[in-house]
A protein has these predicted regions:
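Intrinsically disordered or low-complexity boundary/linker segments at protein termini
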Residues: 1-17, 73, 125-170, 270-289
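General small-molecule cofactor/ligand-binding pocket signal
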Residues: 32-34, 74-79, 132, 182-184, ...
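Hydrophobic alpha-helical segments and helix pairs
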Residues: 94-146
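Structured core of small recognition/catalytic domains
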Residues: 179-244
C-alpha cells in the first residue's frame, strides 16, 4: 500500500515527531527524507549549493536517528525560490513515485493554530499523492504519543456512497494493520422531516450492508448515521469515538470542478485535531467498484 513514503522536513520538533511516527505505517519499505531549501527574499546573497550541502548533512543526522528495521532510508535536498516549497514537494513525490507523503500540519511557524500551515495546505490542495497529515496540536499537549503508537488503531471513514468514497473504502479494506473501522454517513439534505428520516433510514441500511461485508473478512466495523453539516459532524464523531485517524477520499459526491480535492475533505483536513489521511481519487481508480 504505502511502500515508499516521502517525508518533507524543516528540522522542527514537529517534523521530527512525524519521522518517529512513520514506522507504524503498514507495508513501509522505503523512506525518503526531503528538505527544500527556499531562498530568503530579503537575502542579498544566496548560495543554494552550500545550503543544499548543509541540509544534506542535517538530513543524514535525521536518518541515523531513525530506528526502523527493514526500511531503506534515503535523504534528498533541493533548492527553490521562496514560495515554491509545496510545488517542490509535489515534484519530488512524482519523480520518486512515492506512494504517500507524510507531513506535519505546520512547521517552524510559531503562531499557534489548529489550521494547516501554507505548505501543508498547498500540498493538500494541489498534490496528486496520498497524503497523511499529522496534527501538532496533539504533540503540544503531549497526547500525540498514543497516535504514534498505532496510527491505524481506530480509523474513522466518512462515507457518502459516491464512487470515489467506495474506491477509497476498498483501498482501506485491503490495507493491513487497521484495528477498527468506524463508518460515518452525514445526512445533510432534505426539504422535509420525512425526507430527512428517509435519508437516515436508507443510509443506515447501506452502512449496515457494508459493515457486514467488511466483517466477513475479520475487520472490526461499527457504523453511525447523523444529521447535520458534514465537516462539523465528522470532527465531532472523531472526538466522540476518539479515533486515531480520519481517512477519506479526496473527492466525494460533490467535487470542485477541475480540482484535486473536494470541499469537505479539504475543510476536514484543514481543521481536524487529529491525523488525517487523504486518499487521492486519481491513485485509487483501480479500486472503483
Amino acid at each position: 500500500m504505502f511502500e515508499k513514503v516521502l517525508i518533507p522536513t524543516d528540522f522542527s520538533s514537529h517534523a521530527k515527531k512525524v519521522i518517529e511516527c512513520v514506522g507504524e505505517i503498514p507495508g513501509l519499505c522505503e523512506l525518503l527524507l526531503l528538505y527544500v531549501v527556499a531562498r530568503d527574499p530579503l537575502a542579498r546573497v544566496w548560495d543554494p549549493v552550500a545550503e543544499v550541502k548543509e541540509a544534506e548533512k542535517r538530513l543524514m543526522n535525521e536518518k541515523n536517528a531513525i530506528k526502523t528495521p527493514g526500511v531503506n532510508i534515503r535523504v534528498k535536498a533541493v533548492s527553490v525560490l521562496d514560495g515554491e516549497v509545496a510545488s517542490a514537494i509535489q515534484k519530488v513525490a512524482a519523480e520518486e513515485n512515492a506512494s504517500l507523503v507524510a507531513m506535519g500540519a505546520r512547521g517552524k511557524n510559531l503562531i499557534q493554530s489548529v489550521l494547516l500551515g501554507s505548505v501543508s495546505r498547498n500540498v493538500l490542495r494541489f498534490g496528486d499523492t496520498h497524503l497523511l497529515i499529522m496534527r501538532y496540536r496533539m504533540l503540544e499537549s503531549g497526547d500525540m504519543e498514543k497516535y504514534c503508537a498505532r496510527i491505524f488503531a481506530k480509523v474513522l471513514f466518512p462515507m457518502d456512497f459516491s464512487q470515489p468514497a467506495e474506491a477509497a473504502l476498498s483501498f482501506l479494506k485491503s490495507m493491513p494493520g487497521i484495528g477498527e473501522l468506524v463508518l460515518l454517513n452525514v445526512v445533510s439534505k432534505g426539504e422535509t422531516r420525512a425526507e430527512i428520516d428517509e435519508g437516515v433510514k436508507w443510509a443506515a441500511e447501506k452502512l449496515n450492508e457494508i459493515s457486514q461485508d467488511l466483517s466477513k473478512d475479520g475487520m472490526k466495523v461499527t457504523s453511525r448515521v447523523v444529521i447535520g453539516n458534514p465537516v462539523e459532524e465528522i470532527r465531532f464523531a472523531s472526538d466522540e469515538e476518539d479515533v486515531s485517524l480520519i481517512a477519506m477520499s479526496s473527492q466525494g459526491s460533490v467535487a470542485i470542478k477541475k480540482g484535486r480535492i473536494g470541499s469537505t475533505a479539504y475543510d476536514v483536513a484543514n481543521s481536524a485535531d487529529r491525523p488525517v489521511l487523504i486518499l487521492r481519487r486519481s491513485k485509487i481508480a483501480m479500486y472503483y467498484i
